[in-house]
Amino acid sequence: MRKIIHVDMDCFFAAVEMRDDPRLRDIPLAIGGSKERRGVISTANYPARRYGVRSAMPTAMAFKLCPQLTLLPGRMAAYKEASQHIREIFARYTPLIEPLSLDEAYLDVSDSLACGGSATLIAQEIRQSIASELNLTASAGIAPIKFLAKIASELNKPNGQYVITPNQIQPFLQDLPLSKIPGVGAVTAKRLQALGLVTCGEIQKYPLAELLKHFGKFGRVLWERSHGIDEREISPDRLRKSVGVEKTLAEDIYDWESCEALIEELYLELETRLRKVKPDLHIARQGVKLKFHDFQQTTQEHTWPVLNKADLLQIAHAAWNERRAERGVRLVGLHVTLLDPQLERQLLLDWG
């Protein structure tokens, strides 16, 4: 079986700031846009998280939770420099590196001869090198498949690692909450719970045909992940073509005001994701998706190089008026298409 490592830096942007200014180390700190400009939080250190401050949160809300919060606008050049150094450390062990953003990546070390071929020791060495060379901490997950490696990297945060061996996959999955599977949000989790499905072990006993009936193509993903199946390869030349967020509603909505409020909420999350994945390059298009109660959907796009909430609201309002035809809306999504494949390739090759 393969040996996959998922490395995730610990509160990366904030950690770089605390490293460069030790006075920030023990106080609540966040990186993000100002509350006066209706900004959002990109990341927060652990003292701030104890107050409930988290990424994608409106900055104004963060200050309500933690009035003494120190807010910095961020220094993307410093974060990119650190990311490049981290990427160089990864490359000492394998060429099979799939960056997900500035602060996390998958590594396939199946054929690496380092550390006697032990993925556990390789992950430990990588984390030690990051600590000694950059004075930053990273967490890691080690597993034979990608999604379990990612889940494992969260289990001993911060500054730890967790291993799932091939023999441990089935015992681990038995009690694993379905909410841990990427793509299972709050609404999907509630729908699963209504069917009596809370853990991967329960999915293993559930007919695939029923999952397909209730969840469409995603039903197969649920079934495969719950059985420990994830055949996705590590993609060193992975090109991210778009960034998007969407929400399936527990109940259909019929009034524009509800849709507008949801778009306001989704916009904050989209802005945060885009900043993390693509901090300084322009976008090509931005758009809105509405899915109706009959499962038909419409997607409207607008060519514009900068993410703009007013434009997205205008696009959505036009789609609402022109395409809805009195139908209830069950899903709302926002997305941006990234500028150019060559620029995107350079972004990933340069690790930011």
Swiss-Prot record:
PROSITE patterns: UMUC (PS50173)
PANTHER family reported for this sequence: DNA POLYMERASE KAPPA, DNA REPAIR POLYMERASE UMUC / TRANSFERASE FAMILY MEMBER
Subunit structure: Monomer.
Entry's family note: Belongs to the DNA polymerase type-Y family.
Protein name: DNA polymerase IV
Localisation: Cytoplasm
GO molecular function annotation: damaged DNA binding; DNA-directed DNA polymerase activity; magnesium ion binding
Function of the protein: Poorly processive, error-prone DNA polymerase involved in untargeted mutagenesis. Copies undamaged DNA at stalled replication forks, which arise in vivo from mismatched or misaligned primer ends. These misaligned primers can be extended by PolIV. Exhibits no 3'-5' exonuclease (proofreading) activity. May be involved in translesional synthesis, in conjunction with the beta clamp from PolIII.
